[in-house]
């Protein structure tokens, strides 16, 4: 037998380690065509990282308590909006413009002095601050809606008109509140189950079907997972205060099950909206269906009965959280209390890799977007590429300086494209470090 064929592959190693946080990293999100990463920690700090230079774009103390979730989106004209949810019971929306980056604070939390006061440094614009519940340790989920009530997504042309958030109810620990921006109002509540009592809401995911139906997948302290739906598109007029008062949203339960024996720690819905996966304090990872309201298997709330999950896998490793499904659905990953990051097949749910680097427990995972990566080119690099060409027009023979500028722009574009086309996996740990991996 060929000895080369039986050689054990060397363990995977991180591409880079970001050492900026002084406390556990609880939230990660890769955005801006894989060029930016936003991270949030247990002391309330938010850091926006440039994944090309691996340096901070800005850092600020966004919350007085731990950050539960952070999301970033490009909203046109080079601007970014950062959504953060903290244990100080605030859900904040921050705006970061390209022209602001030169004077925004870049001092990382690990370098900040104890005497530094929150807000004393220059930070991004605060657009909204919603009072929401954070006692459950359950992070928000969000979805963008166009004026016709159909799913939308921020782009270079701007942000959709309406944004919806799902968060735990302030009084009913098992209930789900739905908030709306820009009105900053609560528009609906899904009450907790009374029989059986599920305990606190532990994880929630809000999404909108192509027809405009509003879905909420939720997970609970007793191990239950459920799916609710509001049928019918919510057009812009539906968010008016008077309309909501006279026409409260009606919710039907499509699915419920209790595959977990311990509190559910995380769940994520597949981008195709065909299923979702949950992880728990037990060792199980479970794939669940998302019934279509028009399918033959749809059971109205009145005649409801519990259904079976699609697949249950006993991983033999308890305490896996931060579960995320990659955009192509080929793999998903979890962050383990045992300091391991585990990567699984999206189809078979078989364990594909165990990433070992951190010494302490891991809490959060983020994937880069793998969709249409070959065509990804950042707007800034594209404009940089074109400017020297314009300068050369009418100046034939005088290419010494302009030629050099063009070369620098080309190098920058190539660096951006390399980062954009990397299959990023980021993991945040109790040690405050973020490991960046290129995998599958």
UniProtKB/Swiss-Prot annotation:
Protein name (database record): ASTRA-associated protein 1
Annotated function: Component of the ASTRA complex involved in chromatin remodeling.
Family statement: Belongs to the WD repeat ASA1 family.
Entry-linked InterPro entries: WD40/YVTN_repeat-like_dom_sf, WD40_repeat_CS, WD40_repeat_dom_sf, WD40_rpt
Compartments where found: Nucleus
Pfam family, one: WD40
Region called Disordered, residue ranges: 376-399
GO BP terms in the entry: chromatin organization
Keywords, alphabetical: Chromatin regulator, Nucleus, Repeat, WD repeat
WD repeats: 20-59, 62-104, 196-238, 259-300, 315-354, 357-399, 403-440
GO CC entries: nucleus
Top-level taxon: Eukaryota
SUPFAM superfamilies the UniProt entry points to: WD40 repeat-like
Known partners and oligomeric status: Component of the ASTRA chromatin remodeling machinery complex.
Main location: nucleus
């Amino acid at each position: 037998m060929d000895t080369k064929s039986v050689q054990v592959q060397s363990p995977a190693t991180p591409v880079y380690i970001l050492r900026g946080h002084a406390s556990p990293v609880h939230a990660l999100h890769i955005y801006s065509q894989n060029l930016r990463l936003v991270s949030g920690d247990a002391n309330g700090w938010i850091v926006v990282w440039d994944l090309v230079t691996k340096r901070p774009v800005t850092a600020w103390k966004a919350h007085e308590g731990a950050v539960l979730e952070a999301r970033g989106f490009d909203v046109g004209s080079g601007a970014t909006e950062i959504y953060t949810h903290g244990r100080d019971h605030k859900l904040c929306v921050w705006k970061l413009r390209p022209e602001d980056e030169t004077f925004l604070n870049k001092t990382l939390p690990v370098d900040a002095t104890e005497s530094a006061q929150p807000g004393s440094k220059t930070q991004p614009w605060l657009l909204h601050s919603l009072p929401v519940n954070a006692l459950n340790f359950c992070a928000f989920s969000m979805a963008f809606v166009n004026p016709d009530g159909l799913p939308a997504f921020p782009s270079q042309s701007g942000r959709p008109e309406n944004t919806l958030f799902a968060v735990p109810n302030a009084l009913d620990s098992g209930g789900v509140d739905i908030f709306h921006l820009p009105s900053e109002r609560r528009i609906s509540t899904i009450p907790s189950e009374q029989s059986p009592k599920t305990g606190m809401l532990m994880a929630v995911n809000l999404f909108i079907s192509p027809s405009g139906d509003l879905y909420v997948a939720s997970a609970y302290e007793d191990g239950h997972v459920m799916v609710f739906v509001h049928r019918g598109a919510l057009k812009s007029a539906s968010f008016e205060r008077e309309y909501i008062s006279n026409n409260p949203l009606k919710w039907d339960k499509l699915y419920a099950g209790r595959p977990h024996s311990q509190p559910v720690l995380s769940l994520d819905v597949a981008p195709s909206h065909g299923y979702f996966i949950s992880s728990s304090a037990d060792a199980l990872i479970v794939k669940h269906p998302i019934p279509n309201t028009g399918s033959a298997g749809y059971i109205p709330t009145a005649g409801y009965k519990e259904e079976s999950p699609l697949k249950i896998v006993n991983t033999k490793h308890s305490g896996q959280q931060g579960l995320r499904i990659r955009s192509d659905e080929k793999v998903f990953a979890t962050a383990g209390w045992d300091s391991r990051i585990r990567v699984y097949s999206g189809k078979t749910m078989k364990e594909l890799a165990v990433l070992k680097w951190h010494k302490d427990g891991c809490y959060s995972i983020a994937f880069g977007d793998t969709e249409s990566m070959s065509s990804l080119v950042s707007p800034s690099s594209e404009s940089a590429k074109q400017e020297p060409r314009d300068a050369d027009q009418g100046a034939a023979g005088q290419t010494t300086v302009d030629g050099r500028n063009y070369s620098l722009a080309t190098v920058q574009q190539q660096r951006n494209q390399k980062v954009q086309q990397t299959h990023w996996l980021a993991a945040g740990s109790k040690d405050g470090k973020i490991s960046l991996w290129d995998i599958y």
